[in-house]
A protein has these predicted regions:
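Membrane-embedded translocation segments of transport machinery
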Residues: 1-82, 89, 94-148
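Hydrophobic alpha-helical segments of multi-pass membrane transport proteins
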Residues: 4-14, 98-108, 150-174, 192-199, ...
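Alpha-helical transmembrane segments of multi-pass membrane proteins, especially transporters
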Residues: 2, 90-95, 189-192, 215-218
Length: 231
């Protein structure tokens, strides 16, 4: 259901927004990515030291490294009976495709609004934060109330499924004698979901997004040696 909501949102942005511009920037993005992938992967900015690699590249590497064990166990659990090809296409292929579509269309629309002088997106992001920017961008679309409702519902479902997946994996690990075809008790999953929620709220209240970023980097450190040994 949440996947359909995602495609509905992307269709609204594509059709109601500058369609030709969004298609052009999507194609252009692929070219830029292919052209700069190796350089950006090894870019540490030693001369200017602007802080971009640390704040974005390394942070997202650490984010996904910390995320990998939990999601790997979850995908392995729900992929029972499927071939490796199906798992790779489903997890990596369609996952990357969805991320690419969202960043190209949603990000491209924000760039269009900024470039056309319709919205001071960078100013809103700097002074008021991401949540205000999302609301301001949605307000530029037709039927903003409906689009905002769809966005809110989709976001809640995505968050809920992520928490449920994490709670499922943690509950499975903490349940002794659990066989491959068995599931942990629901109350165990509920406890872990609540614990994860409290941790997220606590980190957000303690220092905002910067604290979350720091914890992501710290959490990834123990996993890095395991990934190296697996390779």
């Amino acid at each position: 259901f949440n996947v359909w909501l995602f495609f509905i949102l992307m269709a609204i942005v594509l059709l109601a927004g500058p369609t030709l511009y969004l298609l052009n920037i999507t194609v252009n993005t692929v070219g830029l990515w292919l052209n700069n992938f190796i350089r950006m992967s090894f870019w540490t900015d030693p001369i200017q030291q602007g802080g971009f690699p640390e704040a974005w590249t390394i942070f997202y590497w650490a984010w996904w490294i910390a995320y990998a064990p939990m999601m790997g166990l979850f995908f392995a659990r729900i992929s029972r009976g499927r071939t490796i090809k199906q798992v790779v296409l489903g997890v990596i292929g369609f996952g990357c495709l969805g991320t690419f579509l969202f960043l190209s269309l949603a990000g491209g629309y924000v760039l269009y609004l900024e470039g056309a002088g319709l919205l001071d997106a960078s100013g809103i992001l700097h002074n008021q934060g991401m949540s205000k920017l999302v609301s301001a961008v949605i307000a530029q679309l037709p039927f903003p109330a409906i689009v905002l409702a769809i966005t809110t519902i989709a976001s809640l479902i995505f968050y809920a499924t992520t928490f449920d997946s994490a709670a499922f994996v943690l509950a499975s690990i903490c349940t002794l004698g659990l066989k491959g075809d068995q599931e942990p008790k629901k109350e165990n999953r509920l406890i872990w979901a609540l614990a994860l929620g409290f941790v997220a709220v606590g980190l957000a209240l303690a220092g905002g997004f910067e604290t979350v970023k720091s914890m992501s980097v710290i959490s990834s450190l123990p996993v890095i040696p395991i990934l190296v040994m697996m390779c």
